[in-house]
Curated annotation (Swiss-Prot):
PANTHER family: OS10G0509000 PROTEIN, OS10G0509000 PROTEIN-RELATED. The gene is mutS2. Keywords: ATP-binding, DNA-binding, Endonuclease, Hydrolase, Nuclease, Nucleotide-binding, RNA-binding, rRNA-binding. The keyword 4Fe-4S does not apply. This is Endonuclease MutS2. ATP binds at residues 334-341.
Length: 773
């Protein structure tokens, strides 16, 4: 894409803002080098990567911090004779450690993760990273353990240091030299241990003078007894440097052997830093990723100019920039300084950003065609050097790019045809738009030409729009109204900017004389458009309020239903407990449960306004339902399991949350394949022996221990009342934690006779078989 186009759209400024979110200088440079892609498949991949980066960044799965630019290191690694210095090795170690952390974070991504796949495919400098981590300390120095030679020589250096400190202390003490010294310590000068002697005691301490302090008050003297030790220390220092050089050569060799892996890892880190910067930019202006594909319509919802959006939430007015699938052109009209040019630049800039794999400040559901080319005719393009007027410069530019314009092109025309005779300029502008449409190109044009305004309303495939203004103040509102044209209100703009009133009155008289005063008509159109916008906003607000009320009613109904279910379950448990304690006989318990079920039905109908009626009964055929099938109880909006059915009564006995009750067919509906959940939690289904009244199965997989305990107790209680002797509890394998909790609960339950892990063909250690007393 032409650099001229990107410059006119201020695309480099967006890249500068993007670069500000990068953690490293290499990534910032990569951000500034981004541009529109010519490959739709590559763009789709980049968008998928950005979607994953947004999720990872928001989940704080990986945090980017600054890392050095190691690009110059690769030239060193290409030469067999060159060795990386310590600073270069530290920089390389820092980069590879960040890559290791990135691999750890992104390597866990599973399934269709694009980033996870990229990390998996990227060659990894495993040996180099491990060796650098082993040899380099947190202070940036080579560790003693880097090599046996380095360890040995440093041990001796430390030993000599201790020897010197001991000898100096004894020397000062024996000679009572404390008052002669500036400080009671040994220091280093010229890489040798010396004593800081006061200048006025010069000659009192035999030795070699190495240096003077800046004030001249201190003389640094090496006592003769330290000369031999210092000489040995210098030898060891040389040996240390040689040992360090051998370690650095070894590490350089490893990096050289793995230079392809090092380079790939570094590129991965930089690329991901760029991705995280894109994600940060997206969050900064509340953006999204539009769908970009051949044949998609221009649809940018709540679009804002990115530079204005980044300036603050109130700095940009959101616009819906839309064309129908059969439309290719947008003609924007309205007042000077009303926002027409910003509207065009927003469309072009957001298209360039989307084609570059960047997020755009627009709403969800936005889309764009895949533009291979964007051409811009924007603002004052006159060239004094080439002796070209604005009109001539635009024509020359259009002539140059005209052969390249096709169906994959977006053209932006700002006041095209201005700067010459108005009638000829308008005719030329219409002809250019015709030619662009004939080539299948997309275009957006801003104009003041009346002929082009009428063209926008009458030409098939073209949509007209105008920038609205406040009728009272004549100031622009920077809002776009579609399918109408607007006035230029040049006189009002001139008045706003201080032109003398007598000139404006004279201009108005000339308008009346020429018969060109259409201001009242356009004012009326603007008022109607503004009223329509306000009405649409009011309707949207009213709908939102009504939806809120409906949702609140639904929430209240659900709370009431849940509360009632919990009360019924507690009553049922109380009946079971009294029956187990012998305070209630079997028949009395069954009657009490029947009363509870009746209360459940009555209060359910009261909450929901009664059963569903005849229509529901017709819609649901009870004859095709079998025991064990899942159904929806519409009056409760709950899924239950059919236990029995009575075709004569047109009712079914349904288990909901461990409570069984007869439900009229009018209150039943197909469950759409959803599993039934007891109490909104455990899935309860019959076993093969259910028809004989021998067993039930409950599925507790995925539940927390406290929820599973509640569901299991209710399940066992219900089974006891119904006379079941054998149960199956599905808890899954997993870590075994839920199985242990289930076994603990069963062990403590007074009505459980025994339990054991199911045979392998019935579920193995993922299921427990239970026998009740």
């Amino acid at each position: 894409m032409e650099s001229r186009t990107l410059s006119l759209l201020e695309f480099p400024k967006v890249l500068d803002r993007l670069a500000g979110y990068a953690a490293s200088e290499p990534a910032a440079a990569a951000c500034r080098a981004l541009g529109p892609m010519g490959d739709a498949a590559r763009l789709a991949t980049e968008q998928r990567k950005l979607v994953e980066a947004l999720e990872l960044r928001r989940d704080r799965a990986f945090e980017f911090t600054a890392f050095p630019d190691i690009e110059p290191l690769f030239a060193v690694l290409e030469s067999e004779r060159r060795v990386l210095d310590l600073d270069a090795l530290v920089a390389l170690s820092h980069v590879l450690s960040r890559v290791a952390a990135l691999r750890e974070a992104l390597g866990r991504e599973e399934g269709d993760s694009v980033l996870g796949a990229i990390v998996y495919r990227t060659p990894w400098a495993k040996k180099t990273q491990a060796a650098l981590a082993r040899c380099l300390g947190p202070d940036g120095r080579l560790k003693d353990e880097s090599s046996p030679e380095l360890f040995s020589v440093r041990q001796e250096i430390r030993s000599i240091h201790q020897t010197i400190l001991t000898k100096v202390k004894e020397f000062i003490s024996e000679r009572e030299l404390g008052p002669l010294l500036q400080d009671d310590y040994v220091t280093i000068s010229s890489d040798r241990y010396v004593l800081p002697l006061r200048a006025n005691f010069k000659g009192r301490l035999p030795g070699v003078i190495h240096d003077y302090s800046q004030t001249g008050e201190t003389i640094y003297v090496e006592p003769f007894f330290l000369v031999e030790i210092n000489n040995r220390l210098q030898e060891l220092k040389n040996e240390e440097r040689e040992a360090e050089a051998r370690v650095m050569a070894f590490l350089t060799g490893l990096a050289r052997d793995e230079r392809r892996e090092v380079a790939a890892s570094y590129r991965l880190l930089v690329d991901c830093d760029v991705l995280w910067a894109k994600a940060a930019l997206c969050d900064a202006f509340g953006g999204t990723l539009p769908e970009v594909a051949q044949g998609r319509a221009v649809r940018l919802l709540a679009a804002r100019h990115p530079l204005l959006a980044l300036a603050g939430p109130d700095s940009a007015v959101a616009q819906d920039l839309e064309l129908a699938p059969d439309q290719r052109a947008l003609i924007v009209t309205g007042a000077n300084a009303g926002g027409k040019t910003v509207c065009l630049k927003t469309l072009g800039l957001l298209a360039a950003m989307a084609l570059s794999g960047l997020p755009v400040p627009a709403g969800e559901g936005s889309s764009l065609p895949f533009f291979a080319k964007i051409f811009v005719f924007l603002g004052d393009e006159q060239s004094l050097e080439d002796h070209l007027s604005t009109f001539t410069a635009q024509i020359r530019h259009l002539s140059r790019v005209w052969p390249d314009i096709d169906a994959d092109t977006l053209v932006l025309l700002d006041e095209f045809g201005a700067g010459t005779d108005p009638s000829q300029g308008a005719a030329l502008a219409q002809a250019v738009v015709d030619g662009l449409l004939d080539r299948g190109a997309y275009l957006a044009a801003a104009t003041h030409f009346p002929a082009l305004k009428a063209y926008g309303l009458s030409r098939e495939g073209v949509r007209a729009a105008c920038m609205l203004f406040d009728p009272a103040t004549k100031k622009p509102l920077y809002r776009l109204a579609y399918d109408q044209v607007g006035a230029s209100i040049a006189l009002d703009v001139a008045r706003e900017h201080g032109l003398p009133e007598d000139i404006l009155e004279r201009a108005n008289r000339y308008l009346l004389l020429d018969g060109n005063d259409t201001g009242l008509v356009f004012d009326r159109l603007n008022d109607l458009a503004l009223r329509r916008e306000h009405e649409l906003e009011a309707i949207a607000a009213k709908r939102l309020a009504e939806e809120g009320k409906i949702q609140k009613l639904k929430d209240n109904l659900k709370k009431a239903q849940d509360k009632l279910v919990e009360e019924i379950r507690e009553l049922s448990r109380d009946i079971v407990r009294r029956h187990e304690a012998g305070r209630l006989g079997r028949k009395e318990a069954q009657k009490a449960l029947a009363d509870v079920r009746k209360r459940l039905i009555d209060e359910s109908n009261e909450l929901t306004g009664g059963p569903g009626g005849e229509a529901a009964a017709v819609a649901f055929d009870l004859s095709v339902v079998a025991p064990g099938d899942s159904v929806q109880v519409t009056s409760w909006n709950k899924i239950g399991v059919v236990r029995e059915k009575d075709l004569k009564r047109q009712a079914a006995k349904v288990d909901i949350g461990g409570v069984s009750l007869w439900v009229n067919v009018a209150d039943l509906a197909p469950a759409a394949g959803k599993p039934a959940k007891a109490g909104g939690g455990a899935v309860v289904t019959p076993t093969a022996s259910e028809a004989k009244g021998l067993g039930l199965v409950v599925d507790l997989r995925g539940m927390r221990a406290d929820v599973a305990e509640s569901e299991l107790l209710a399940f066992v209680d219900n089974a006891l009342l119904r006379g079941h002797g054998e149960l199956e509890v599905i808890h899954g394998r997993g870590t075994g934690a839920l199985r242990r909790e289930v076994h603990r609960m069963l062990k403590d339950h007074p009505q459980v006779a025994s339990f054991a892990i199911a045979p392998e063909d019935r579920g193995g250690d993922g299921m427990t078989m239970v026998t009740l007393k």
